[in-house]
Structures are given as C-alpha cells and as structure tokens.
C-alpha cells in the first residue's frame, strides 16, 4: 500500500451522477483525512475539490451496447493505462463509482494486485445479467448500494454490501419551493410549465430529442397556455437540442437553461424525462412525471432478452409497482407521450405525492457520511 502517512484514494466516475457521488464522498473522507490525495477519473465537481483526473470523464459517458462497441478500443486503452498507473501508485483504496462495465474489470485487476476495492452504486444485477454478482464478489472488497432492496440480494449471495442511501435524498428538501425555483430561473410565477429533460448524454438526445420536441408541439395545441422549459447539461447538448428544435419545431418557444436541472424540475408542474438518475431527482422534488426512453433497435433486442424486471424507472423500482408511466422503445412516440403528459397535468396527484414522500424518507440516510465510514473501516482494517 501507499507507504507515506498520506492516504491515497483512487476513484473512477463515469458520468454526471457519479461525479456528484464522488464529490460527496471526497468531502466526507476529507473530514477524516484532511491531507488525502484523490486521483483517477472524475467530473467537474470532483475536480473542484482537488481531484487529479488522469482522463476526461467524458471518455466513459457512452450509452447502449452497440454504441459502446465503436468506442471499445479507446475504453480498453484508458483502462489499461489506469491499471498501470494505479498499480504503480498503490492507493489505499480504489472506489469505482457506477460505470460497472468499465470499473468492475478495473477493480478485478487492482484487487489482484493487493489493492482494496469498493464499488459505489450497485450494478443492476437484480434486473439483468444476475451472474455478474460472482464477478463483483471477486472484484470488490465491498459494494456500497444506494437502494434498500439491493442489500438483500447481496446478502443472499454472501457479498459484503452496505446500504448507504442516496445523496440526492439528503440534498433535496422534503418540500420543494416551486415559486422560488421560478424566481431563480426568471419564469412566469403564474403559468403552467412542463419541464422537458431529454438526457445528459449525446446518445440520449439523439434518440429522444425528436419525439420529445414533437410531443411538445402537440401539447401546445392541446394546452395553448402551457409553457416549456428544458435544462441542457452543457453547450454541446444545448446545440444538439437546438438543432432538433429547428428541424422538428421551428416555431415552438422553449425556455432553455444550461445546467440547473433540479431547479428546472422544482419549477415545473410536470416533467417529461429520460429514464435514469433524473427520474429519482424528479421523484425527490415531488413532481408528477412521464418517463420515456429508447435506444438503438439492436441494443434494445439484446438488452430485452437479459432483463428480469417489469419496470425501468427508479420510482417504480423503489415502489415495487408502477406509480408513474413509462414509455419504452416502441411506446416512446409523440402521441403516447402527449396522452401520458396530459394525464399527469390533469390528474389528482395526492396519492403519488404520498408515495414519493415515503420513498424520499427511506433513502435519506446521510449517504456520503455512511459511504465514507464504510471506506474508512475497510482502509483501517489490516
């Protein structure tokens, strides 16, 4: 292990949600180890805390089985370089944050070199490819899970796992202030707003921008006073979305915001969004939503054959039943989106809000502190 008194933690975060988790964990670990060094692949929030990124985390932000194949040589080269660098560095612990197809192989190699490894965010082994749990058991000293039902799955297979809760549930208040959010964004305090979130990755916008924009046009016809607001994660995604608007809805007025997705969701009356971590955020800000998603037909056919779940979005998975509508693949059409969004705009939301509140409280556990404590105990165990 690292021979000096300074603790060294290596981390790899694969996308924005991982960057948030990584930043929270770094802050919590610094409480115990103020002089610790953090190195690997991180996003902007991690970098702002002094994290040393060896590669841009955009390298890992690839969606879909088919899409990954075209980038595979580069991904393998990045992983090989990381293995070499970290084997030489010998950190006190390696923490792979999500990105399981990249990180678990990395963890396997590092653990074989005597480096303690943690995987933060359980892969969806309970949903598809369940045999991955045997590789996870070999690759990691411990899994940190965000969702309460995951620990039981790991316990059943005798894989060390700690349920830590979710940082988003800690960060987002139990009650979100719609008027304050609108004031922050300069939105009309009296209008009805639909937030449209087509995803944070280029591949997601490629698949979802067109049906989302076309649905917005139809919704405007049905609700002439309805307004739209869309957060885009960066200038590149904004340009991609603006091209979809120009192509499919040149006359549609949508208020575009760079970043601030949580504020946008809090400002909205309802949300149309891609499946992913954003659905959890929408649940935590207590807004009715419609989840839609599609990938390339080949990716979908391969994935569908491996799936062992009946729900895709986190709110439905946490509830164990469908509490919000999901429009997946062939169902992700403008007309179906319009009908589902209309039901959310016009419906009685009291039972849904009660479900959201219960789930929020289950996940609110001071996740970063719990995760840090689990890592500290692992590192301090000889």
Swiss-Prot record:
One of its GO terms (biological process) is lipid A biosynthetic process. Keywords: Glycosyltransferase, Lipid A biosynthesis, Lipid biosynthesis, Lipid metabolism, Transferase. Condensation of UDP-2,3-diacylglucosamine and 2,3-diacylglucosamine-1-phosphate to form lipid A disaccharide, a precursor of lipid A, a phosphorylated glycolipid that anchors the lipopolysaccharide to the outer membrane of the cell. The keyword rRNA-binding does not apply. Pathway: Bacterial outer membrane biogenesis; LPS lipid A biosynthesis. It catalyses: a lipid X + a UDP-2-N,3-O-bis[(3R)-3-hydroxyacyl]-alpha-D-glucosamine = a lipid A disaccharide + UDP + H(+). Disulfide bonds: none annotated. Belongs to the LpxB family. Its EC number is 2.4.1.182. SUPFAM superfamilies: UDP-Glycosyltransferase/glycogen phosphorylase. It comes from the Bacteria. It holds the Pfam family LpxB. One of its GO terms (molecular function) is phospholipid binding. The gene is lpxB. It comes from Shewanella loihica (strain ATCC BAA-1088 / PV-4). This is Lipid-A-disaccharide synthase. GO terms for cellular component: membrane. Signal peptide: none annotated. The keyword rRNA-binding does not apply. It is an enzyme of class 2 (transferase). The lineage of its organism: Bacteria, Pseudomonadati, Pseudomonadota, Gammaproteobacteria, Alteromonadales. PANTHER family: LIPID-A-DISACCHARIDE SYNTHASE, LIPID-A-DISACCHARIDE SYNTHASE, MITOCHONDRIAL-RELATED.
